[in-house]
Structure formats: C-alpha cells, structure tokens
From Swiss-Prot:
Encoding gene (name): glgA
InterPro entries: Glyco_trans_1, GS/SS, Starch_synth_cat_dom
Keyword field: Glycogen biosynthesis, Glycosyltransferase, Transferase
List of residues binding ADP-alpha-D-glucose: K15
Annotated protein name in UniProt: Glycogen synthase
Native source species: Prochlorococcus marinus (strain MIT 9515)
Enzyme class label: transferase
Lineage per the UniProt record: Bacteria, Bacillati, Cyanobacteriota, Cyanophyceae, Synechococcales
Length: 483
C-alpha cells in the first residue's frame, strides 16, 4: 500500500512530544511489511540545515490564497522519504503557539490535501492530532484515498468552526465544533494511542467534552499502543551512557548513577535511592503531586530526586525552590537535554510518572528499557504497559496507584523505597522491566490491519498469532517471563 503520514512533528528532526516519536519510528516497521510509506511535515526553518533537501520543489500549488512548495528529503536515520511543505509561515521554526497557529496548521493541512490529490496519491492518508484534522474532511470527497486519524492528546482540539469557515471558505462545513471533532467525524478510522485511553476518552472524566461524539463513532474507534525504537534506545550500545549495560551486567548501572549524581549536583552515593523524571512540567504530568509529596518523602527517606524538563512557570518555580531547600538531595534542570535524559533513564533507580491522564506515554517504556522502575498512576497507556509489582508472586514491572491524590502517590513512593532496600528482589524487578517487548513491530501489524480494513483489501492479513508474538506486557525472552 501507499501510505502517507501527515503530522506536525517527526523525530528526531522535529520533536516536542510522543507524536514525533510515532511519526518518526512507525514508517520503518511498515516499510518492512512491504509498504511504500512516506511522511509530510511543515518545512520548519531549522530543517533546511538538518536535512539534505532537493534543490528544487517537487510540487508547487496555491491554496487558501497562498502559494506553497513541497520539497523532498530523506529521514536522517531510516532513509525513507520526507516531504516538507515550504511557506514563509514556517520559516521561524516555531512549532506550536503563536498568533497564527490556527491558520498555520490549517494551511499545512490544505497543502497536504492538494499535494495528495495532484502529486503523490496515497491509498491511506494517516493524520495525527488536530493539526491535520481538516484533511479527513477534504479527503472524504475522494473515494480513492482513505483516511486514518490518530488521537495523541484529546485535550488539544484546534480552531473552532467559525474560524475554520473563515480560513478555508468551506461554508458546508457544519459538523463538529472544531478541527478535532471534524477529523473524528470524517475520518474512515480513528485510533487512540493505547487501548485504555481509547476507552477512557468515551467517558465524561477524560472525554474533554467529546465523549458523546466518541461514543457515537465508537464503531470505527480503536486503541493501538505506541512502541519505541529498540535500536535507538538500547542501554547495551547507547554511547551517551558512561557505562553500557544489559540484564547480565546490571551492576554497571551504578557507574551511570554516580555520574548522574555528579552532573545534577546531588550527593554522590550509589546506595541512595534516586528517583528520576524527564517530562514537560505541566499539570497533565502530575508535577503538582511531585511538589506536594517531595518534602515529606525527603524527610522520611534517604531518597534523592532528579528532574529534567521545562513547562509552566509556577511549576518550574516550585521545583526550583525545592532544589534550594534540599541541596544535594533535590535537583532540577529547567531545560531539555537528550544526553542528560538518557543518563536519567540509565542511572536513576526509579522513574516518576504520576500523570493526571496519559494517552500512551513513552517515558515509562524507555525507563523500563533502561532498568529504571516506573512509579505511575494507573491511567491511559500506563495501565497497558506497567504491571503492578507483586513481591509475593515475584511479578510486575513497576509501582502503581489509582487516585490522583498526594497520599496515594506518596504511598506508592514509600512502597518502592522499601522494595529498593531488598537488593536481590529489586534486581529481579529490573530484569523483568528490561525484558518487556515494546518494539514498533506489533504496532505496525495492528496499523496494517486497520489500513487494509479501511481500504477494503481482502488479501490475507498477518495471522493474529503473529501479533500475539509481540504482545505487550510479555517478556522478550520467554525464559524470563516468571522471574
């Protein structure tokens, strides 16, 4: 099949959140299944220096009263074709925000539609989040192009109908209040990025006022869990880590822990319980819970906390104050640094993800891959990926809590701290976590089934047993399943 992914991000060139990882990493797995897969993204200013781009555009056209050009490049790691939509509105390099954000992404969506009709016509146009939400509306009139729409985060829903009508001159567009609703109505298939999140968004609590619509379209809604690139994220060959390691030489992780403590200004002591967090510092991620429980945790235990990320100023200020109050025990770097994030994954003992909601989550997958035990709230993709630790039966991969309450989070933290003191069982917990299979291979098979379904292709699809071989929550090594 010819498959075109349209999105605002594509890792590693342009990445803000999990969408960038999906759009960057899913195509290689689909290509291995025999499909012609390409990606189209806005031509942000910095991309012209990062990629080898065709000197002349492969396509020019006019839409929404503006001329645009499409250039061809190659993904820097996986070498598949990436198309860049060139227009001055993208030159600043700003991805999200700004006064023209609504117009900017509606223009990108319209340009992608023109490109798909007139240059490279896919059988499936796979759109991601509200930034591409108008594409299924326009493609609905073309029987040769089927559309799939992926919900990465329902909270962000795009411009409202009155603004869309003004920008696109589509007075017939009378269904749905905004871009996200339009996409869900007109797309041939809709998926969320985890099975649990697909169920949650049909409820009032998590539906962001769209639960009624999501129940209405539930027949074409499904959940497909994200994966991670196991070659890019492999502690055994990760050159960023001072000490590479695997499940057979876990003792080497302590070298990374010591370097992490030094770099983040913490007391250097490999016996201390070190909690890490790499996150956008926003309410969704439960940073307010971290603020509420940290003083008590540091008073009761000998723990250390290392946090990396940027976000809301009031949360940044609260974390910064904790770092001032607890020097050597609490550290926060208000930036994003890929090398330091890898060191946190590969050097911390446990990883914090007390999310209010979590469509899928990538960080808990990376943490487990690198032997850092996740402490998570049982919500969204965290339910699908982190198995509760059960010391009596020697199973589980992390520590979980249910209610978004400080006492529940604190209790989970104390349980993890107590478990950490039992070194032999903690090592087995790390081995179980590191042995989980979270590759893109299973996800690609599920997407392929959905693509074939939406295109009405009747030739045999992959046997369901092939998908089960890559079942999430299962060990990559059968001999380790019962450790």
């Amino acid at each position: 099949m010819r498959i075109l992914l349209a999105a605002a991000e594509c890792a590693p060139m342009i990445k803000v959140g999990g969408m960038g990882d999906v759009v960057g990493s899913l195509p290689p797995s689909l290509i291995k299944l025999g499909h012609d897969v390409r990606v189209i993204i806005p031509g942000y200013g910095k991309l012209w220096n990062l990629l080898e781009i065709s000197s002349e555009p492969v396509f020019r056209a006019n839409t929404m009263g503006n001329e645009f050009s499409v250039y061809e490049a190659k993904h820097p790691i996986h070498n598949y074709i990436v198309y860049l939509v060139g227009h001055p509105t993208f030159d600043s390099g700003q991805i999200y925000g700004g006064e023209d954000e609504d117009w900017r992404f509606t223009f990108f969506a319209s340009s992608t539609a023109e490109f798909s009709w007139n240059y490279w016509k896919p059988q499936v146009l796979h759109c991601h989040d509200w930034h591409t939400g108008m594409i299924p509306v326009w493609m609905h009139q073309d029987p040769e192009i089927s559309t799939v729409f992926t919900i990465h985060n329902l909270k962000y829903q795009g411009p409202w109908r009155w603004k869309l009508e003004k920008m696109t001159w589509c007075p017939w567009y009378m269904h749905g209040d905004h871009t996200m609703a339009a996409a869900m109505l007109y797309a041939d298939r809709v998926n969320a990025v985890s099975p649990t999140y697909a169920d949650e968004i049909k409820t009032h609590e998590y539906g962001e006022s769209l639960d009624g619509l999501l129940n209405y379209i539930s027949g074409k809604l499904r959940g497909i869990l994200n994966g991670i690139d196991l070659n890019e994220w492999d502690p055994n060959i990760d050159k960023v880590l001072p000490a590479q390691f695997n499940i057979k030489n876990l003792e080497r992780r302590s070298e990374n822990k010591i370097i992490l403590q030094k770099e983040m200004g913490l007391e250097v002591n490999s016996k201390k319980y070190l909690l890490g967090m790499v996150s956008r510092l926003v309410d969704q991620k439960g940073v307010d819970l971290v603020l509420q429980v940290s003083k008590r945790l540091l008073a009761y235990t000998d723990s250390q906390i290392a946090i990396l990320g940027t976000g809301d100023k009031y949360l940044e200020s609260g974390l910064w104050q904790l770092a001032l109050d607890y020097p050597g025990r609490f550290s926060v770097f208000l930036t994003y640094d890929d090398s330091l994030s890898r060191l946190i994954y590969g050097g911390s003992d446990a990883f914090l993800m007390p999310s209010r909601f979590e469509p899928c989550g990538i960080s808990q997958l990376l943490a487990m891959r690198y032997g850092s035990i996740p402490i998570v709230r049982r919500v969204g993709g965290l339910v699908d990926t982190v198995l509760p630790h059960d010391p009596e039966n020697n199973c589980g991969t992390g520590f979980c809590f249910d209610r978004f309450e400080p006492i529940d989070f604190y209790t989970a933290l104390v349980r993890s701290w107590e478990a950490f003191r039992h070194k032999d069982s903690w090592k087995l917990l790390q081995i179980r976590a590191m042995s989980q299979e979270f590759s893109w291979q299973r996800s690609a098979l599920e997407y392929e089934l959905m693509y074939k379904d939406v295109c009405g292709i009747k030739e045999p699809s992959p046997d369901i047993t092939e998908i089960e071989k890559f079942s999430y929550g299962q060990s990559a090594d059968p001999s380790l399943k019962k450790i």
